[in-house]
Structures are given as structure tokens and as C-alpha cells.
């Protein structure tokens, strides 16, 4: 194994961050370490602790030009059974295959190290750069995400801060670093549906109303519905039922209600209000006595080809020689909150094959490549 002092600045920082057990929403002083580095490089620092969540906002530059923000999270998901890991998940070692192993290596302490080192180099090489380089970092991405990026964005918007471009360090790559970037995400709309019946004895169904029998045709119709056709950037909106619960546990009792939980992953072709109305129309069509609690996790967003996507794509080409693919697949990310400011958002990070898994790992050399891509993107946009 390579000695720590012989590693690149990016890998040294990545290892230092991984060795801090920052299971969400705990930051474990990861942000303190990043702020120390950025402060030494001349960034203005603004810690923002909101409830039990650590966040910070940092900027470099005094011009009125465009703002390029790096966004990310220091929190990680729990390790799962430590005995299932080949190493201590918070020890952070580079194995004989050149893989950096540890919780957060891919998601997303590797990216945090790459963007920090890239920004340090850029402001040293171009101290009078155009506009501003910014960082928006949270410890509440893997958890509820109420007091992290969402809350910071609300504060920034309230004081009329502008973010023109944002690179989120989520692990976007699939096989090779930079082979895929995310230029958008689907929206996520969840629902808890309660269908009310009348409880009774199974031998006397005429004295009861079975909510399972009543709800089944409506749920089947919802599952078969074509909500939209998608577009050039998004697949069609999907509807999935994740839970259905009813019954008292007894075999001779007709239950009094049924609860179904479902989720839409929706494209820009659909709206929250439109989906809610269509669901209500189908439920009413079946004559149900129903109630829904809706939960919107995020609206869909899309960054079409333009300054940011062009700069990221050409930087990947310059450094790796490969053409990148822009995709909107996958789950939600904090990019959904930043996009509400009218910001162009692109997610670019290392290979995501082992995120949230036991023995999470990333090719160590990829983080140095990622640093170069971030650095070149800074040059193209702000030098």
C-alpha cells in the first residue's frame, strides 16, 4: 500500500475525509477540514448550522460575473454489518488493485476532495478570475434533507444570491469516470392512500364494505395508466405501488380500511397538480371513500445543452478522450433544490457501482482524473 505522504493532494484529502465517521446527519468535522483548506486558499467562509445539520457556503472572487458552485455532502449512509467489510469502513485504504476502499469513497468524499483541490489550484493560478467560485456543502443529503441544501438555498435566495452554474459531485459515472453526467432528474411525488370501508364478519358481507375489494380495481387502473410519453430527455412517468396494508390479522374479519403507499417518478411532461387530479378522478370513478396524504420530494429539473454542460463535456473529452453521455436516470439528488434558483445543474462524480454497498470503493486514480476535469471546467467558465 502507498504511504499517505506519497499520494496526490486529492487522495490525501479523500482519505482524511473518509476516516471521519460522518454517518448522516453527523459531519464529524469533515466540513471544518474543508473550510480550513478553502479559507487558506482565500475563500470567504460562512458556516450555516441549521437545527442538527452542519452546512457551509464559501465564495472566492469579487466580480459581478457568473457564479460557478460546487455542491456536495459530507454525510454518508450507515455501513451495515462491519463484519461484512473486508476492511474497517472508516479506515480508508488503497488496496493492491488501486481501489480506494471505505464508506463514502464514491458517495461522495472522493468528489469533495477532487473539487476542493481543483478549486485551490484554480484560484492560485487565476487569482483574478471572472465571477465567483462557490461551495455549498451539507451533512444532510443522505437523511431527511430538510435542513441541508434545501434550507441553505432558501437563505441564499432570500438575500438575492445568484448561482449561474452548479456541479454536484454525485457519483454519476457508470463504468469509467466521466462516461455519464446527470443533466437532470425526475421529480418524486409520494402518496399514502387510505380507502375506508366498513368492518364486519366475513360470513355477513352484506353488513360490511370490504375496502380491499373496493380498492383493488382502482389500484389496478392506476398501475395500468399511461401518465405521459416522456420526451427527448426523460422516460415516461412511472407509477409504483410500494406497500398495501389491510386487515386485522384475523381470518374471519372484513377490515375497515386499506392503506396503499405509491410513488410517481415524473418527467417534465407532467405536473404535480395534473397527477394529483388524475389520481383523484380514477378513485372517484370507482366510488371510493378515500383520503390521500401527498409528499413531494422534488420537482423534475433539466439542464439543456449550454455553457455548463458544454464546458463539462469538453473537459471530460480533453482529459479522458471520451465522449460523455448526459442522462436523467436515477433517484433524486440535492440538485433539485439548487435548480429552483434557475441554476444550470450538472452532476459529475466517480463510478457509482458500489455506492451504499458493503466494501464501497472507487479507483483511486479516478479521483485525480476527476480533479483535472473539475479544474479544466473552472478554466473554461471563469478564467
Curated annotation (Swiss-Prot):
<feature type="binding site">
    <location>
        <position position="142"/>
    </location>
    <ligand>
        <name>Zn(2+) 2</name>
    </ligand>
</feature>
<comment type="pathway">
    <text>Amino-acid biosynthesis; L-lysine biosynthesis via DAP pathway; LL-2,6-diaminopimelate from (S)-tetrahydrodipicolinate (succinylase route): step 3/3.</text>
</comment>
<feature type="active site">
    <location>
        <position position="75"/>
    </location>
</feature>
<comment type="similarity">
    <text>Belongs to the peptidase M20A family. DapE subfamily.</text>
</comment>
<feature type="binding site">
    <location>
        <position position="107"/>
    </location>
    <ligand>
        <name>Zn(2+) 1</name>
    </ligand>
</feature>
<keyword id="KW-0862">Zinc</keyword>
<dbReference type="GO" id="GO:0009089">
    <property type="term" value="P:lysine biosynthetic process via diaminopimelate"/>
</dbReference>
<feature type="active site" description="Proton acceptor">
    <location>
        <position position="141"/>
    </location>
</feature>
<dbReference type="InterPro" id="IPR005941">
    <property type="entry name" value="DapE_proteobac"/>
</dbReference>
<dbReference type="Pfam" id="PF01546">
    <property type="entry name" value="Peptidase_M20"/>
</dbReference>
<dbReference type="GO" id="GO:0050897">
    <property type="term" value="F:cobalt ion binding"/>
</dbReference>
<protein>
    <recommendedName>
        <fullName>Succinyl-diaminopimelate desuccinylase</fullName>
        <ecNumber>3.5.1.18</ecNumber>
    </recommendedName>
</protein>
<keyword id="KW-0378">Hydrolase</keyword>
<dbReference type="GO" id="GO:0008270">
    <property type="term" value="F:zinc ion binding"/>
</dbReference>
<keyword id="KW-0170">Cobalt</keyword>
<dbReference type="Pfam" id="PF07687">
    <property type="entry name" value="M20_dimer"/>
</dbReference>
<dbReference type="GO" id="GO:0006526">
    <property type="term" value="P:L-arginine biosynthetic process"/>
</dbReference>
<dbReference type="InterPro" id="IPR036264">
    <property type="entry name" value="Bact_exopeptidase_dim_dom"/>
</dbReference>
<keyword id="KW-0457">Lysine biosynthesis</keyword>
<feature type="binding site">
    <location>
        <position position="170"/>
    </location>
    <ligand>
        <name>Zn(2+) 1</name>
    </ligand>
</feature>
<feature type="binding site">
    <location>
        <position position="107"/>
    </location>
    <ligand>
        <name>Zn(2+) 2</name>
    </ligand>
</feature>
<feature type="binding site">
    <location>
        <position position="356"/>
    </location>
    <ligand>
        <name>Zn(2+) 2</name>
    </ligand>
</feature>
<dbReference type="GO" id="GO:0009014">
    <property type="term" value="F:succinyl-diaminopimelate desuccinylase activity"/>
</dbReference>
<comment type="function">
    <text>Catalyzes the hydrolysis of N-succinyl-L,L-diaminopimelic acid (SDAP), forming succinate and LL-2,6-diaminopimelate (DAP), an intermediate involved in the bacterial biosynthesis of lysine and meso-diaminopimelic acid, an essential component of bacterial cell walls.</text>
</comment>
<keyword id="KW-0479">Metal-binding</keyword>
<dbReference type="InterPro" id="IPR001261">
    <property type="entry name" value="ArgE/DapE_CS"/>
</dbReference>
<keyword id="KW-0220">Diaminopimelate biosynthesis</keyword>
<dbReference type="GO" id="GO:0019877">
    <property type="term" value="P:diaminopimelate biosynthetic process"/>
</dbReference>
<dbReference type="InterPro" id="IPR050072">
    <property type="entry name" value="Peptidase_M20A"/>
</dbReference>
<comment type="subunit">
    <text>Homodimer.</text>
</comment>
<feature type="binding site">
    <location>
        <position position="73"/>
    </location>
    <ligand>
        <name>Zn(2+) 1</name>
    </ligand>
</feature>
<keyword id="KW-0028">Amino-acid biosynthesis</keyword>
<dbReference type="GO" id="GO:0008777">
    <property type="term" value="F:acetylornithine deacetylase activity"/>
</dbReference>
<dbReference type="InterPro" id="IPR002933">
    <property type="entry name" value="Peptidase_M20"/>
</dbReference>
<dbReference type="InterPro" id="IPR011650">
    <property type="entry name" value="Peptidase_M20_dimer"/>
</dbReference>
